[in-house]
């Protein structure tokens, strides 16, 4: 089987991939993450996942390369990674007491340019929390580098009232979908 490369430097994505116990390595894709404004959220994450996978695949054409991208959507607004604590506070205020969606695009590009891709959506509802609790959560700095300004795999799970879908999707990589794509590509487990 060809080498497997994760087109990401995300520690959360690497931790999820490590759980599969498949040999792989991670490499930064180094791509522009700006997409056309007319794209829907699901089209945008599909496009970005493809862009990341293809960028690394160009450097390693005989490998299978897995790319992923994630966006948070609440009330029709897309939330990306906050630039600072104030932006994180504003994002979290939009999420508390409401349901939002996490969309993750996954793209697997292989030898000969074979492409397998999918988009996974998970819906989450946050408790209504008081401003003081929100500030204490912000003090933990889990918002740094996270779409939506929280980490459900850490203390952010205490904000979570309900989750519908794949929990690993919320952490950055929908593993049920990833395993399906890897199996379709011919990867064997165990």
Curated annotation (Swiss-Prot):
It comes from Myxococcus xanthus (strain DK1622). Belongs to the Maf family. Transmembrane segments: none annotated. GO terms for cellular component: cytoplasm. It holds the Pfam family Maf. InterPro entries: ITPase-like_fam, Maf-like. It is found in: Cytoplasm. Nucleoside triphosphate pyrophosphatase. May have a dual role in cell division arrest and in preventing the incorporation of modified nucleotides into cellular nucleic acids. It catalyses: a ribonucleoside 5'-triphosphate + H2O = a ribonucleoside 5'-phosphate + diphosphate + H(+); a 2'-deoxyribonucleoside 5'-triphosphate + H2O = a 2'-deoxyribonucleoside 5'-phosphate + diphosphate + H(+). This is Nucleoside triphosphate pyrophosphatase. It comes from the Bacteria. Keywords: Cytoplasm, Hydrolase, Nucleotide metabolism. Its EC number is 3.6.1.9. The active site is at 69 (proton acceptor). SUPFAM superfamilies: ITPase-like. Its cofactor is a divalent metal cation. PANTHER family: BIFUNCTIONAL DTTP/UTP PYROPHOSPHATASE/METHYLTRANSFERASE PROTEIN-RELATED, BIFUNCTIONAL DTTP_UTP PYROPHOSPHATASE_METHYLTRANSFERASE PROTEIN-RELATED. Its main location: cytoplasm. One of its GO terms (biological process) is nucleotide metabolic process.
